[in-house]
Design a protein with these regions (language model features):
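Mature catalytic core of soluble alpha/beta enzymes
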Residues: 1-305
Length: 305
């Protein structure tokens, strides 16, 4: 059973994947681990390794179904029908696999992810350590529930928006603290600006120079009210091989680090998850397509090439 928070995170992630045409994809966790860019001895995987791993990715292999109270057989039939319709729509015949339902481990994983998000190393991210487990047990409860069905060997990994989710969770908490009128919370490359400053002036967020030294800023963004700012770039997590930079932002369509001519994207949005995910998607898409994507969400961005 997935509660409303976890369901919302999955829904928003899949919607972003659809709108970006897969430039953001929450199923490439295995590909990220294959590259192991933050490991001790990263190296470029072989073409065959990347090809084999890509076969197990693809956001269209994730099916989220909200299920009202009904008997198990009816629930299974409805979800199977939804899977078939979705597969036909995308023109990609799904392989014959068991209809696995994510059990309550998914919710525990989500909670752990938020609690441990300060450690943003892929191998230490809770959602990477404790993979979403599946079981043949079907959920039958008196409450409305959500079930996830994952095809083949695909895995769902919300680590790519984990920092943004942490900001959203923090914002919800701050809303309940009447004595807090303003706060700044930074989680890796994502920042929550909450409320207002005590002196009434705007929040000022520095935009780092991707090729500068010691966190040198190349500009400042002035913002008011509650908002989220997330940055994705090629300059903090990367390795060099044969004179070429291999960064951690992978293009789900190729399996290799994205090559869009951009070196940094900063996104401003009222939603933490979206600011985090959009910065990644825009980096992969490039400036022109990235700007169009931001417009569909009413978000703003800074593109550096």
């Amino acid at each position: 059973k997935l509660d409303s928070a976890m369901t919302s995170w999955v829904e928003d992630s899949l919607e972003l994947a659809r709108r970006s045409n897969g430039a953001f994809d929450p199923t490439i966790g295995r590909l990220t681990r294959l590259w192991n860019i933050e490991g001790d001895n990263p190296k470029v995987p072989s073409k065959q390794e990347i090809k084999n791993t890509l076969k197990d990715t693809g956001y269209t292999k994730i099916h989220l179904e909200k299920v009202e109270t009904q008997n198990t057989d009816t629930t299974k039939k409805n979800v199977d029908k939804d899977r078939k319709d979705n597969t036909d729509k995308n023109g990609d015949a799904a392989k014959d696999t068991d209809n696995n339902t994510i059990n309550s481990t998914a919710q525990n994983t989500a909670d752990n992810m938020v609690n441990n998000e300060a450690d943003n190393t892929p191998d230490n991210t809770a959602l990477n350590e404790e993979r979403l487990e599946t079981t043949d047990k079907k959920i039958n409860t008196d409450e409305s529930v959500s079930s996830i069905y994952i095809e083949d060997q695909c895995t769902l990994d919300l680590g790519a928006v984990g920092k943004g989710i942490a900001c959203d969770v923090a914002q919800n908490y701050l809303k309940q603290q009447k004595e807090v009128s303003g706060a700044v919370i930074a989680v890796g490359g994502s920042i929550l600006l909450y409320g207002s400053k005590a002196d009434g002036t705007n929040w000022n967020v520095a935009v780092q120079n991707p090729r500068g030294k010691d966190g040198e800023a190349m500009g400042v963004v002035s913002l008011s009210g509650t908002t989220n700012v997330s940055t994705s770039g090629d300059y903090e997590k990367y390795f060099m091989q044969n004179g070429k930079r291999y960064h951690h932002i992978l293009d789900p369509s190729t399996g290799y680090p994205a090559e869009s001519s951009l070196i940094s994207v900063t996104v401003v949005s009222d939603n933490g998850l979206l600011s985090d995910g959009l910065s990644t998607a825009c980096f992969v898409l490039g400036k022109e397509k990235g700007q169009k994507l931001l417009e569909t969400y009413g978000a703003e961005g800074i593109f550096i090439d």
